[in-house]
Amino acid sequence: MKLTCVMIVAVLFLTAWTLVMADDSNNGLANLFSKLRDEMEDPEGSKLEKKDCQEKWDYCPVPFLGSRYCCDGFICPSFFCA
């Protein structure tokens, strides 16, 4: 009986997880790959090349020592630029 309940809960959890994580737009992966290809063809359009620092509330890998990752005027007190 316990095993049956555990299996039912596991199936429900995995079903819910799949529905939550599913991309609801049509042809989502194709759109993603076409955007990435366009950025590779046009390096000026790439956001990564334009931005060398992290903006406010962006992740910084090393707190207290990671202020060099944040843009000017921001510090990294707890894994996020503030």
From Swiss-Prot:
Q: Does the keyword Disulfide bond apply?
A: yes
Tissue specificity is: Expressed by the venom duct.
Q: Which superkingdom, per the lineage? A: Eukaryota
Recorded hits in Pfam families, A to Z, give: Conotoxin
Q: Which residues form the propeptide?
A: 20-51
Q: Which InterPro entries match?
A: Conotoxin (IPR004214), Conotoxin_omega-typ_CS (IPR012321)
Q: Is this entry keyworded ATP-binding?
A: no
- Per the UniProt entry, the signal peptide is 1-19
User: What residue intervals traverse the membrane?
Assistant: none
What GO cellular component term, any one, is given? Answer: extracellular region
Q: Which cysteines are joined by disulfide bonds?
A: C53-C71, C60-C76, C70-C81
Q: Where does it localize?
A: Secreted
PROSITE patterns in alphabetical order: OMEGA_CONOTOXIN (PS60004)
Which controlled-vocabulary keywords does the entry list?
Answer: Amidation, Calcium channel impairing toxin, Disulfide bond, Ion channel impairing toxin, Knottin, Secreted, Signal, Toxin, Voltage-gated calcium channel impairing toxin
Please list the GO terms describing molecular function. Answer: calcium channel regulator activity; ion channel inhibitor activity; toxin activity
Q: What does its UniProt record remark on the domains?
A: The presence of a 'disulfide through disulfide knot' structurally defines this protein as a knottin. The cysteine framework is VI/VII (C-C-CC-C-C).
Q: What does this protein do?
A: Omega-conotoxins act at presynaptic membranes, they bind and block voltage-gated calcium channels (Cav).
Which family does the record claim for this protein?
Belongs to the O1 superfamily.
The name of this protein is Conotoxin Tx6.6
